[in-house]
Amino acid sequence: TWRQSLARPLVLTLYGYEQEAEQRGSIVRMDYDTRDYAEGCGASRTNTAYIYLPYGYDEQKRYNIMYLVHGHYGTASTYFETENGMLRKLLDQMIAHGDIAPMIIVTPTYNYGQPTANYTDADPYCKALPQELVNDLIPVVESRYHTYAETTDAEGIEVSRKHRAIGGFSMGAVTTWYAFDETLSAFKWFMPISGDCWSLGWFAGMNRPDETAAYLADKVRQSAYAGTGFYIWAASGTSDSASVSYTHLRAH
C-alpha cells in the first residue's frame, strides 16, 4: 500500500540497495508548456521534468505515481544524477525486493533557469509549483503514461488522487506542504522531508507551530478529505537543523 511504501525506512547500503539491479528502470526527459504562476503575469514558458519508468513498464497496467521535488540549488534532473544515479538504483532494488510495487516517479522543478541565490527567494516559486503540476504537468504525464487517471481534467485528477503522491526534500518539502495546503484535491499522499511548512510565512512551522497546525487542520476540515482522506509522512534526520520544526509540528 501507499502507506507502507512511504513509511518504510530507506536504508541505502543494507542488502546492496546502492548497487545496480539486474532489472533497471528507465529515465525519460519531458519538456512541457506551462505559465508563470509565481509572478502573476501568466507568461508562457517551458519547463522540464524527468520521469522514472519501472523495469517492464506495461501500457496495459496502471501505476501509482509520485511527484518528487528537489531542494534548493537543485534541478529537475538532480535526483537522478546525484550519487551516480542512486535514486534510480534504490527504486530498482526496492521494486526487485518487493518493498514497493512498480511505480512511476516524476521529478519536476520550481526553478526556471538558474536557482535563486537565497533559498527563501525561491518561496514564491515553490508555492506556485503545485498549481503548475495540476494544471500543466499532471495532464501531460498522466495522459502519456498509464496511471489510474481515466482523464486528466480536474475531475479525473481528483478521482484518481488516492493513487498520487507528492514529496520533496528541503525546499521540495516546503513545496509539498504548499501542495497539501492548496491542491489537496489532487494528492492523497504527502512526504515532506527536512523542510518546514511556510503557509503562514517563512519557518512558520517552527516559529508558530500552534497556528500552523491549526491552519492545516482547518484546511482539512473544510475539505472533503477529513479523516482517512489524506496521509502525511514527514521526516527529518535528528542531526538536521530542520528537525526542530518537525518536533514542534508533531507535538500538535
Predicted regions and their residues:
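Non-catalytic cap/lid and distal C-terminal segments of serine-dependent acyl enzymes
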Residues: 1-250
